[in-house]
Amino acid sequence: MFKIQLSVTSFILGVLCVACSKEEAGHGHSGSDETNSEPYIPVEVISNAHTVTYLEPRTYIIEEPQSSQGNVCYLILGEERAVMFDTGAGENTMVDGTRMRYVIDQITDLPVTLFMSHFHFDHNQNIAEFDHVAFIELEYLVEGTSSEGVYEFSDTELVFGSYPASVQVNEWWPLDTDIDLGGRSIRVVSIPGHTDESAMIVDTQNKLMFMGDYIYDGPLYVFGQQNLIPYETTVDMLIANYDDSFSVYGAHGSPQVPHENLQKLKDILVCIQEGECIPSMTNIWGYVVQRYNLNGMEVWVFLE
């Protein structure tokens, strides 16, 4: 896997390049398809609010360096459909009436399904720009959805604010089952710890893991001491099933996370549970927070 940093030259040249690249992309295949005689050509994206980087194969890292949360989202392309992993913090100025969709529309004409890593406010603020939304198929989420397919977000799930109040769920993605995008398959895996609904997208063929807020470049947030146990259970599963041939990508800060950080996370969680790590105390957003640090890995536990 490698990255190609997309640079923006002038608006006119960029628009011409986008038009050409989108046409070619419509006939291209995943970089993992050896039968393809016309390799996929990455699109140059114009945006004053985003840094867009191409990741082989057919994946775009969409960073929001100007957002207060430093969000990172991912657009994952197949041949027949695309997946938007998270929607962004929604703090940038609209372009053509949208904050994220105008970026996507420069890249692809494929139908796009939104799948959120979890429901916190900084991952769902552009949710209204998507007309097809998939949820991870967890029993309590299915039971909490109305007969019309509407899911209402709680204040706890959002953390801050009251938007979005609800969303229409169009598709349920079962755990550990291939989701066919056309020439490329992904899986959704439950990774509780940061939140109960936390999920990652795994491209097993291309060895890519998109992990949301479970692990990223920065202090990891645990909301309540009771979530330390599921956090540790999840990291045990990850270490056992995804070796260092997989590349790890998070939802904040620098997109790629060293795979070895999974073991560092395991070490600090054990240290906390065994009472060997001593926290410093602070207040954040009105919460009392225990801040732990071990070997460069930080875990902040928000006390309820």
How would you label these PLM feature ranges?
Residues 91-180, 267-274:
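Active-site HxH/HxHxD metal-binding segment of metal-dependent hydrolases
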